[in-house]
Amino acid sequence: RQRFGVPIERYHDKRRAEQLRGLIRPFILRRLKTDPNVVADLPAKVESREFTHLTGEQASLYESCVRRMLTQVDEAEGMQRRGLVLAALVKLKQICNHPALALKEGPVAMGGGPIDPSRSGKTIRLLEMLEEVLAEGDQALIFTQFREMGAMLAPMLAHHLGKQVLFLHGGTTQAQRQQMIDTFQRAEGTYPILLLSLKAGGVGLNLTAATHVFHFDRWWNPAVENQATDRAYRIGQTRTVQVHKYVCRGTLEERIDQMIESKTELASNIIGAGEAWLTELDTRQLRDILTLRNDAVEDEA
């Protein structure tokens, strides 16, 4: 790690990256879907970012969390500091998803019904896009790294879209898992939406009935995200796959999205991407990443 990891990840040392590439080249054979010799008839994959705004409630929660976190980080060192950084990043991502997730309100709101989509810019946009997907008779996968978020989204989507929504997560039994997959793959239109927790549904599934993949929140490691997308974009897929990655403007999500793209470019050269780089940021860098920008909340005027 000291010889290659730190120089490459932190300082973007091209010479060390070239040395590492030379060392591992004899031991790694990469076979990419973009190589026509590997898969000649795989259709196109179109990736896009869906930029959303925070609601006023989200912005207030976000700024409060940032102030508290920066104060704590200034007083901590070593492993304690790293833990505080990661915990704060998770909390801020939860706020970006929906206030109910960050406030631990549970899947059913106080009124007895599903969560209110108008409290989050992401859920507002997700409903709009899914209405278009369903109008075309298409099917969709929705990935989230938070099981609790999936539990909130499922009843909300079913209520507003009038369709049954399947939810596959770590607590799903093997029998239930296979039944969900079979139901979704039959493509009869009754169950056109499959929600998946990223770790439980990100690998080992064939879900080619889907032509839209939504990443409701982003993972630190792009390879994990790509594996999830490949549940739909794989051998057996006959139509173009649209991949939608949600990013909240003016928040840490937008800055981390830019950093992820940098990591992806680096990973394509040295085959690998880690997560430790997030905890290595100094307080000045953290403040720059976390501070809410002026464009985070949409100007109602």
Can you say where each PLM-predicted feature lies in the sequence?
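Generic recognition of well-ordered alpha-helical segments
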Residues: Q19, L23, F27, L61, ...
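Short, polar/flexible loop-turn hinges at active-site or ligand-entry regions and domain interfaces
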Residues: V6-H12, T71-M79, W277-L278
